[in-house]
């Protein structure tokens, strides 16, 4: 049986692969994206797992042994149970607050502003403060200059759904990296969020991999600055 198209990874750079998958919220097909990074020891660090399928499992296993399964915020955890069951030796990593929200979910360690020694040689991380209902962490893969963004901002330059296009245009988030109105409303302490973004702008970002939308291959630092210049 041929491999389904969305089960095959795309290589963006050395040690950086992404898996795209269908994902809908409120009738809007936002799509989802999982990023798989190969760490210096050869193990895999999996960001925001998409829906589990045997085909995706096989494709991930072909890249290396899974060491970490990462929920980057309080929303992107729905597929962790299936992936953690498939890879019981992998450590499940999540932000503070997810244990209380999903007590049945196995969580082995909580994220903070200090990268784990296993990924610190190649990966920086930062807690976006001022958004307690989201508790999102940004991650920056230094070797490839790749920033991983979950729900903080979308990046859609094309969409098949007219409803999604209309939604994004109404949110001033069409054909640019930008937060939606919902994300803006979730910023309860804008000064704290602004300070977090300013710290992220110190990273030498070229590529931005969003979980919803298309990968931004170039000009990531300027796009990030422009997305939050209103703050």
Tell me what each language-model feature is.
Residues 24-68:
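Pre-active-site segment of Zn-dependent metallo-hydrolases
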Residues 12-16, 40-44, 117-124, 143-146:
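Beta-strand-turn-beta hairpins that frame and shape the catalytic cleft
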Residues 22-26, 44-50, 68-72, 123-129, ...:
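Short, flexible loop segments at the rims of nucleotide/cofactor-binding pockets, characterized by
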Residues 2-4, 8-10, 24, 45-46, ...:
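Metallo-beta-lactamase
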């Amino acid at each position: 049986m041929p491999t389904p198209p969305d089960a095959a990874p795309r290589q963006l750079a050395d040690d950086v692969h992404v898996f795209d998958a269908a994902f809908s919220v409120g009738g809007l097909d936002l799509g989802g994206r999982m990023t798989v990074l190969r760490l210096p020891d050869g193990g895999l660090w999996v960001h925001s797992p998409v829906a589990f399928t045997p085909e995706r499992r096989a494709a991930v296993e072909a890249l290396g042994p899974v060491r970490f399964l990462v929920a980057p915020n309080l929303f992107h955890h729905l597929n962790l149970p299936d992936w953690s069951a498939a890879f019981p030796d992998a450590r499940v990593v999540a932000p503070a607050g997810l244990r209380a929200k999903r007590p049945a979910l196995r969580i082995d360690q909580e994220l903070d502003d200090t990268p784990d020694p296993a990924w610190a040689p190649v990966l920086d991380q930062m807690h976006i403060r001022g958004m307690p209902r989201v508790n999102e962490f940004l991650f920056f893969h230094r070797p490839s200059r790749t920033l991983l963004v979950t729900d903080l901002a979308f990046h859609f330059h094309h969409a098949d759904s007219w409803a999604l296009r209309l939604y994004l245009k109404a949110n001033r988030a069409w054909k640019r990296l930008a937060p939606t109105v919902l994300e803006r409303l979730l910023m309860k302490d804008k000064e704290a969020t602004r300070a977090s973004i300013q710290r992220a702008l110190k990273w030498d970002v070229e590529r931005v991999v969003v979980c919803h939308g298309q990968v931004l291959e170039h000009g990531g630092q300027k796009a990030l600055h422009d997305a939050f210049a209103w703050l």
